[in-house]
Amino acid sequence: MSIGRFSAGIAALIFSPGTRRYLLLRRSQQKDYAPGIWECVTGRVDQGEGFGDALHREVREELGVDVQAEYILGTTHFYRGAATPENELVGVIYLCSLDEAASIQVSKEHTEYRWLTANEAMDLLSSTDPSTQWTKRVIGRADTIRPMLSDDLVHYLSETGFEFG
């Protein structure tokens, strides 16, 4: 087996428990990958950084707020463009909570944000591109899993964290 290179990343789907709405961001038209699409917070893990630290750093950079990581929705593996080693990315997807009244300041990576119910998000995410379809699957999973989890389990997971060091 040959040793290759890939990047690690995170995604943060942010949920407002009080309104049961999800936060979506529109990517800047200046972005090199998937410009103008609606997405959740995404970003790369820096060298020497854990997934949890990357999650909180990326959310602060993109939104100017801190979130509570509630649980891991899943993992992802994709190519950011052509299927070449330099475009390969593996990542962890978190569901995070944030009060909708929080003062969000979007970075230059995005042009706007919206709080949407799952149904509203599905309507907005009408493009057939792979990134949009991925975001739809993430929201669909979150909206299915969240009601199944007990408050005690979600509290335990959010308080103890996810990394074992």
Describe the role of every protein-language-model region:
Residues R20-E61:
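Conserved Nudix-box catalytic region and its N-terminal flanking loop in Nudix hydrolases
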Residues M1-L23, L95:
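Conserved N-terminal beta-strand and adjoining loop/helix that marks the start
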Residues H77-S103:
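Active-site-adjacent beta-strand/loop module that shapes the phosphate/pyrophosphate-binding cleft
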Residues I14, I93-S97, W115-T117:
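Short, well-ordered beta-strand micro-motif
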Residues S2-F6, A34-I37, T84-V90, H110:
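A generic structural micro-feature
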Residues K108-G165:
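Nudix hydrolase/Nudix homology domain
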Residues G9-I10, G50, T111:
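Short loop/turn microsegments at loop-to-beta-strand junctions
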Residues D66-T75:
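A short coil-to-beta-strand element that immediately follows conserved catalytic motifs
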